[in-house]
Amino acid sequence: MNLIVLFKISTGQRKQNNDTVLEKDSIEVKMEENNVKKADSTGYIVKVGEMAPDFTVTLTDGETITLSSLRGKVVMLQFTASWCGVCRKEMPFIEKDIWLKHRNNPDFVLIGIDRDEPLDKVLAFAKSTGVTYPLGLDPGADIFAKYALRDSGITRNVLIGADGKISMLTRLYNEKEFTLLVQKIDEMLKK
């Protein structure tokens, strides 16, 4: 029997780039078969310092990757979708400031994970944004749901250290936060 209960307590919600954003003092609780997961105000159900939930993703070229097989590498997951305007804004910066700088580093992996879209749409999306970093398919948003509430918005980056633990979580696109993400990746790869 599957039991899913979602509670939301908030002093308010606001619209931002077509996403509903819960205010900072919000609490969300999601229960799945006796497993209680608390979400932060951005919808994340994981926290910095925790082991990143494992998953298997199929890339647009057909390659299949399991996150746990990347242990020992710095991994950046970028949750995205073609219909997301903020994602489209952020992706060229990820391409230029992160991917092109580190794509030849054997200790770094970047995977864009496209939420619930078919292969042809994801390929067209990559072409229209000009990104060359690997994109994976997330049918049903099952990978996304390991990191955030399934019904929360995208434009999320998850930075995972070589030890498999989450080092940084971002939501939406903020220049200062993005600069910190780039700096953190650079620092982690110097070690």
Give the location of each predicted region.
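Structural microenvironment flanking redox-active thiols in thiol-disulfide oxidoreductases
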Residues: 88-129, 140-146
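Hydrophobic beta-strand anchors of alpha/beta hydrolase catalytic cores
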Residues: 76-77, 110
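Conserved redox-active cysteine motifs that mediate thiol-disulfide chemistry
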Residues: 71, 79-96
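A short beta-strand-turn-helix
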Residues: 46, 55-75, 147
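Thiol/disulfide oxidoreductase modules built on the thioredoxin-like
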Residues: 127-132, 138-186
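N-terminal targeting signals for export/organelle localization
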Residues: 1-51, 191
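Short loop/turn microsegments at loop-to-beta-strand junctions
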Residues: 52-53, 74-75, 154-156
